[in-house]
A protein has these predicted regions:
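The feature marks the mature, well-folded catalytic cores of soluble enzymes
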Residues: 1-261, 267-268, 274, 278-280
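The first (N-terminal) embedded transmembrane alpha-helix
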Residues: 296-319, 372-374, 431-438
Length: 574
């Protein structure tokens, strides 16, 4: 059984650039933001941009207050006459045209000036082609099929270009026929290199797989071409826009499934499709499939996080040479479960747009999650009260802080709407909370005081949770950018964040190696270096395009907590 994700799936350079331009403007400008037509051909991304106040228009007359507006030229580009009209209106204009489309425009402009007629091979109704046609000065012809070549008039001076997302094989065939009719034709291969690579990979993959899933907007020309190419090699090809389109598909007959996506398809949709396929495939397995499904269920419901918190609490107690208390392990597990669930319920992303792999479960059983979270926090507080008053007060105020973080909003004139909008606040607050319930609370019992061992335990818990949280956000950086969530990867960028995390991991490694010889902690600290080595392996998820489902990726990151618990077992044995 195999599920393979194409390396070229998802946003191309031009789409990513256009989206980044828009989001950067949205972050720093107070003016109303408009795009001249849909920025890219993906309905889900367009809806997300609308939720941030970025509205597509078809005519500049739709903008009432032109002095307080910014108009962004879509990635597909526009005709020069339209550009002049926009500039003469006095609007502030930002050009997000794909540089590769701009290159084709420059070719047409140059050869039109040299008295050439221009043949554009592409889709007649596509906005890119419409924009290119505007550069021909009325001397352009659009060719969509091989048969249409017969209708073009003979001309010695002909320049041939392609829509950047054209099918390469079809373009070559059309060019050959044009040359038979116009032997002096000047031909440019203006198909984007990423388009060629994407098409080549899909063709090769479709020949090897039992089924192909092509993910992307039904209005996306390049996605439709990918589906057509896959269909030629593999009859079981499905062009889907969202995971909802997969509800009636039977995965039973397919053991090897390939997945690719159009140039306008965001990563979160690809991830959800991968989740759906992995769920379908795992049901076909027997014993291993049952265990895998149980593991994924625990991840989706945050039970796995709760178990991880219990493991970290056990580790922190033993690091500090504190007698193991099942009560504190239960407090940590219950509190982390409750706060994670409440955080997801109170601060959910737009469900129909960027639903995480947990979203379906939270939508279906929302009330049940509220009840279980409420009971968990009540039990955690009761156990804490039974232990000691300082433990109860610490936990109670930590619970209040969590509620304030998720519910309190700032005045409208402030730059940030809530605590959640502060850059990196989610990563830091989560790590501090875990550090308190796993390391500090057990130390408050009886006569234990703050010391070097407690500091090491807190630093270890904080550090490992912070690294896992930030790594998870690196994988979600695209959707977080779109909805305006200021995580550390969004604020610092992917590469800088990975560098920061590697530095933190090295500091953790050094602390663990010296803490026992210096008498600060037990010798367990040596074995815990395994967790740091495991996180370094996980860095590969961020450095390369992951081919696993979102739930599996999240589960592998959270396994760093469980691994810490296994280190205790090894320590006890040896």
């Amino acid at each position: 059984m195999e599920v393979k994700l194409a390396k070229t799936a998802g946003f191309c350079m031009g789409v990513r650039r256009a989206v980044d331009i828009v989001l950067d403007i949205a972050q720093h400008e107070t003016s109303r933001i408009y795009t001249y037509g849909p920025l890219i051909h993906n309905p889900q991304t367009i809806e997300l941009l609308k939720s941030r106040g970025i509205r597509p228009i078809e005519n500049i007359e739709e903008i009432k207050d032109k002095n307080n507006a910014i108009l962004i030229i879509r990635a597909h580009g526009i005709a020069p006459d339209e550009r002049k009209k926009i500039k003469s209106s006095g609007l502030k204009v930002v050009d997000a045209t794909c540089p590769k489309v701009g290159y084709v425009q420059s070719i047409i402009k140059k050869h039109t000036g040299l008295d050439y007629s221009v043949i554009i091979v592409g889709d007649r109704e596509h906005p890119e082609v419409d924009g290119l046609l505007g550069y021909t000065g009325g001397r352009g012809i659009i060719i969509s099929t091989l048969e249409e070549v017969d209708k073009i008039p003979y001309n010695e001076k002909v320049c041939v270009v392609a829509q950047t997302t054209q099918n390469l094989d079809d373009y070559n065939k059309i060019v050959e026929k044009i040359k038979e009719k116009c032997s002096q034709a000047v031909v440019f291969n203006t198909i984007c290199s990423s388009t060629e690579q994407r098409q080549a990979e899909v063709t090769a993959m479709a020949s090897e797989m039992d089924a192909m899933f092509i993910v992307g907007g039904k209005n996306s020309a390049n996605t439709r071409r990918l589906a057509d190419l896959a269909q030629k090699k593999q009859s079981s090809t499905f062009h889907i826009e969202t995971p909802a389109d997969m509800e009636k598909i039977d995965f039973g007959p397919y053991n090897r499934i390939g997945v690719s996506a159009g140039a306008s398809t965001p990563n979160w949709i690809i991830d959800r499709v991968m989740d759906k396929i992995m769920d379908g495939q795992s049901r076909k397995l027997k014993n291993i499939g049952t265990l895998l499904n149980l593991w994924i269920y625990a991840i989706k419901t945050d039970i796995y996080s709760a178990i991880g918190a219990g493991c970290l609490c056990l580790v922190c107690m033993l690091l500090q040479n504190i007698p193991v208390s099942l009560t504190f392990i239960a407090i940590a597990s219950l509190f982390v479960y409750a706060m994670h669930v409440l955080h997801r319920l109170l601060g959910r992303k737009p469900a129909n747009l960027v639903g995480s792999f947990r979203e379906e479960s939270y939508q279906r059983y929302g009330k049940l999650y509220y009840y279980t979270a409420g009971l968990s926090i009540v039990f955690a507080l009761a156990l804490a009260f039974n232990k000691a008053l300082p433990v109860f007060l610490f936990l109670f105020f930590l619970f209040l802080a969590g509620l304030i973080y998720n519910t309190i909003t700032f005045p409208e004139q402030w730059n940030f709407k809530s605590f959640k909008d502060l850059p990196g606040s989610k990563n830091i607050s989560m790590s501090v909370a875990w550090g308190i319930v796993t390391a500090i609370l057990p130390a408050l019992d009886k006569d234990y005081s703050f010391n070097a061992g407690l500091t090491v335990a807190f630093v270890f818990s904080f550090g490992i949770v912070f690294i896992r949280s930030a790594m998870s956000d690196i994988l979600e950086i695209q959707s977080d950018k779109l909805i305006g969530q200021e995580t550390i990867p969004v604020f610092f960028g992917r590469k800088r964040t990975i560098t920061i995390l590697k530095i933190i991991s090295l500091i953790l490694l050094a602390v663990l190696l010296v803490s026992s010889p210096l008498g600060w902690t037990s010798s367990l600290s040596f074995l815990l270096t395994i967790c740091i080595l495991y996180l370094w392996i996980c860095f590969r998820f961020c450095d390369n395009k992951p081919v696993l489902s979102g739930a599996v990726k999240e589960g592998l990151l959270e396994t760093s907590y469980i691994l810490a618990g296994f280190c205790v077992l090894l320590w006890r044995i040896f």
